[in-house]
Amino acid sequence: MMKPLRQQNRQIISYIPRVEPAPPEHAIKMDAFRDVWILRGKYVAFVLMGESFQRSPAFSVPESAQRWANQVRQENEIAD
């Protein structure tokens, strides 16, 4: 007899970007990019959405982080 899989009725959690209050103190702002900060050797974008910041995943190149930020901004403009 096969063991039943545990937690069959567990709901699937979809990815929701974390809302950060602001870039942390130890993040270093990159002057060349509008939304990109250096965080632990990776590039992270913070985009202000209304009252709070949305934080991107960590990227290894700043251009990717900025592209993410631009996309989030565009999507938000469409949603409004």
Curated annotation (Swiss-Prot):
InterPro entries listed in its UniProt record: CedA-like_sf, Cell_div_activator_CedA
Signal peptide: none
A GO biological process held by the record: cell division
Family: Belongs to the CedA family.
Protein name from the UniProt record: Cell division activator CedA
Keyword Cell cycle: yes
UniProt organism field: Salmonella arizonae (strain ATCC BAA-731 / CDC346-86 / RSK2980)
Keywords from the UniProt entry: Cell cycle, Cell division, DNA-binding
UniProt cross-references to Gene3D superfamilies, sorted A to Z: Cell division activator CedA
